[in-house]
Design a protein with these regions (language model features):
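A generic structural motif
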Residues: 147-149, 161-165, 209-213
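Buried hydrophobic-core signal for structured, non-transmembrane domains
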Residues: 142-148, 189, 206-210, 232
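Short loop/turn segments at connectors of secondary-structure elements within structured domains
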Residues: 90, 152-156, 171, 202-204, ...
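Intrinsically disordered, low-complexity Pro/Gly/Ser/Thr-rich segments with frequent PxxP/GP/PP motifs
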Residues: 157-201
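Substrate-binding clefts and catalytic carboxylate motifs of secreted carbohydrate-active enzymes
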Residues: 1-154
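Short, aromatic- and glycine-rich surface loops/edge beta-strands on solvent-exposed regions
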Residues: 197-215
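Short hydrophobic alpha-helix segments
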Residues: 106-107, 173-175, 220
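Short beta-strand elements
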Residues: 215-232
Length: 232
């Protein structure tokens, strides 16, 4: 299988939006913003708001709406890409839609019309890297996959740290791992209780790092609930 087209929309940067919109029209429901939204007959902005409210809470202003649309897009596509890469060999490819734009507006791109990178483009550099640590959490358990597109196997270390929102280390472990070539390898399955060890899931997060020759070549932050519930 090769997943060749999947995506989530977001808005371009505020600098790009201001190139086609007057200050008085900076609203998801304004005629100009709807005209620059080609999904669902101009109603796609309401879909963006639905997911933003569900996962991040109510945006405090238009700038926050634009910013959160990019965060939502980046985290959603990253989740899909990690699932697809970790499912190798059942899934042998992952291409999100789309790279760039032919005009400025809300779209599925990771680079906007003027060449400005959205948040997704920065995330894609990490989740499409040749070596990737991909923790996949569902139903209170996390499976940890090591994904390699390299043609030679290697030995590495997998570091796991659990920290609180103030940056304090709660506990950590360091394991030797073998990373086969051209493969996805499941190296651990961890229950939330084992990761948290009594810590508050809304005040804690896990950091997974794949370390090769003393350097972290892949890093992934795992949260235990949606962002709107976290106590930052």
């Amino acid at each position: 299988r090769f997943q060749s087209e999947y995506g989530l929309q977001s808005f371009p940067s505020m600098a790009t939006i201001r190139s086609f919109t007057a200050p008085a029209a900076l609203s998801p429901a304004s005629p100009v913003m709807r005209a620059h939204q080609k999904f669902d007959g101009g109603h796609g902005n309401q879909s963006l708001l639905f997911y933003i409210r569900k996962y991040y809470g109510e945006p405090k202003d238009f700038d926050s709406f634009v910013y959160l649309s990019q965060v939502m897009q980046a985290e959603g596509i990253e989740l899909a890409a990690d699932h697809l890469r970790s499912a190798r060999p059942q899934s042998m490819g992952s291409l999100y839609w789309q790279l760039n734009d032919v005009w400025p507006g809300a779209s599925w791109s990771s680079i906007d019309y003027f060449g400005r990178w959205k948040t997704l483009q920065f995330h894609a550099r990490r989740f499409y890297a040749p070596l990737r640590v991909a923790p996949i959490r569902r139903d209170g358990r996390t499976e940890v996959f090591l994904v390699s597109d390299r043609t030679a196997p290697l030995d590495a270390r997998l570091r796991l740290r659990v920290m609180d929102m103030d940056g304090r280390l709660l506990h950590e472990r360091l394991d030797q791992v073998h990373v086969p070539a051209l493969a996805s390898t499941r190296v651990a399955e961890l229950a939330d209780a084992a990761l948290l060890q009594g810590a508050d899931p809304h005040r804690s997060f896990a950091v997974f790092e794949l370390i090769v020759q003393g350097r972290a070549v892949s890093r992934h932050l795992l949260y235990f609930d949606r962002a709107s519930t976290l106590q930052l």
